[in-house]
């Protein structure tokens, strides 16, 4: 008997959805940063074992939108809860249910498939706090399973996979067994660069950073030559991203190159520039160019 199913992971921004996905896959697949809302596109990640296949939809955190990009991210997360076989609602024990959590719960009550409550970061919180959070959420709605985990340390991740297998239906293998992600290489490369920029810039530059890959060519020796722009919204942000004597941009390129080489399994040369595009997050045509779906 072979089983297959689509699983979506939902939760507030920065709750650890991408970290959980990486722990399940044991590979770095989704942009992870300490900054909220760093996952912007629904990334379908495929886990294939001998007797099952799980297709994960890693979504942006649900939050109140402040611009067109925010509207896209919220719609993207909401749409992902439709037409799936299982929903994982990820929370942190050290945070009481806020407006964002209550908003998600109201949506989950309308879902016709099993919903798991997954408590992340249990290694960072005392058992009493975890138990208190469990009780609070259990009173808000009924969950098919409640699983405490540590996505970062991998604790109880195998148990979570076993429970997911239990709930998904019998079905075909939708993707080839060697396929682990359904996004193209350019998208992944852009996300890796953006992650490094977010990490290195910390709070120096607001969240309005995007990356566009201008060129990505592979020569006869198998080496990739990549060129791209880091987009920011204000002229004042440009020198911050570049850094003194180009030091910050050089570090972004260096750290990104290491991860891109691991992803592509090839040597990589990468050149990055910084370009100002004011209010790009409200520019519908530019959002489309960067791979974000058109809002209806």
Swiss-Prot record:
Region spans: G1: 11-18
Region of interest: G5: 149-151
Domain Era-type G: 3-170
Annotated KH type-2 domain residues: 201-278
Stretches for region G3: 58-61
Domain of life from the UniProt record: Bacteria
Gene Ontology terms, MF aspect: GTP binding; GTPase activity; ribosomal small subunit binding; small ribosomal subunit rRNA binding
Region (G4): 120-123
Keywords from the named record: Cell membrane, Cytoplasm, GTP-binding, Membrane, Nucleotide-binding, Ribosome biogenesis, RNA-binding, rRNA-binding
Stored Gene3D superfamilies: 3.30.300.20, P-loop containing nucleotide triphosphate hydrolases
NCBIfam families: era, PRK00089.1, small_GTP
Protein name: GTPase Era
Organism the protein comes from: Clostridium botulinum (strain Kyoto / Type A2)
